[in-house]
Amino acid sequence: MMNKNSRLYTDSNIRNTFFAEIGIGVSANSLLLLFNIFKLICGQRSRLTDLPIGLLSLINLLMLLMTAFIATDTFISWRGWDDIICKSLLYLYRTFRGLSLCTSCLLSVLQAIILSPRSSCLAKFKHKPSHHISCAILSLSVLYMFISSHLLVSIIATPNLTTNDFIHVTQWCSILPMSYLMQSMFSTLLAIRDVFLISLMVLSTWYMVALLCRHRKQTRHLQGTSLSPKASPEQRATRSILMLMSLFVLMSVFDSIVCSSRTMYLNDPISYSYQLFMVHIYATVSPFVFIVTEKHIVNSLRSMCVKVMNV
């Protein structure tokens, strides 16, 4: 049995911190998802980004729930899992992580489209129906599920196995070593996907920052520097997306650094625990970014609380 996990589930501080992070993330994403469902049921006017925001909260919620279940095999002495459970859980977890990346990228691009002026070539996409967004998300989902399909073959249950030839994921689940050709092919596909989506995020973020800076200069020129113009809903939404994308890129860099160090030191439980914690910060914090920065969400939640208190 691998030493790092046996040491991890005996450390109550690491275990409690990790499950506290998961609990906070599940609660926040559930709240944001329920708000979007409530908004849809009440027939309120939806924005172009409402569907991706609701979908992102659902994906993060499912990923965190899946993480909590998988973590029982990492931090808690648990009965053994068979191949089917290992393959299903880890494949779904990796799929949800990929979908979170795809949806975040789509959200960034859509917000750039919303903020674009009428003279921009992106303005024609503002009034596209929501089923175009659904098709884009579905296409990205199918593509990523195909890229991750090798996990259904390479993930196996490894009870009472101590060899270092396997990449241990949890106490009972490991990844079989692949041939150099297969490993290179899937690594290249994943690298192309990540570089493309993150580059698209960076470009759309840079475009939004440029538009916001230009708008601020124009507003100051028209109203004078003594006045502080009130931010429009589109600008507030853009700032929340910018915060979200900055957090995502930062967490991706940290995850890459920790993952590289874990590759160098396979039996180091400290780097493994850091990776477990860091990789889920984005899914935990992202709903708070929307809840805090979007005034209509805060006002709606406040009115709902008042109604509940008056019942």
Swiss-Prot record:
GO terms for molecular function: pheromone receptor activity. It is a multi-pass membrane protein. It is found in: Cell membrane. Residues 39-50, 116-135, 210-239, 293-311 are cytoplasmic. GO terms for biological process: response to pheromone; sensory perception of chemical stimulus. Residues 1-17, 72-94, 157-188, 261-271 are extracellular. The chain crosses the membrane at residues 18-38, 51-71, 95-115, 136-156, 189-209, 240-260, 272-292. One of its GO terms (cellular component) is plasma membrane. Expressed in 1-4% of neurons of the vomeronasal organ. Only one pheromone receptor gene may be expressed in a particular neuron. Not expressed in the main olfactory epithelium. PROSITE patterns: G_PROTEIN_RECEP_F1_2. Disulfide bonds join C86-C173. It comes from the Eukaryota. InterPro entries: GPCR_Rhodpsn_7TM, Vmron_rcpt_1. Putative pheromone receptor implicated in the regulation of social as well as reproductive behavior. This is Vomeronasal type-1 receptor 105. It comes from Rattus norvegicus. The gene is Vom1r105.
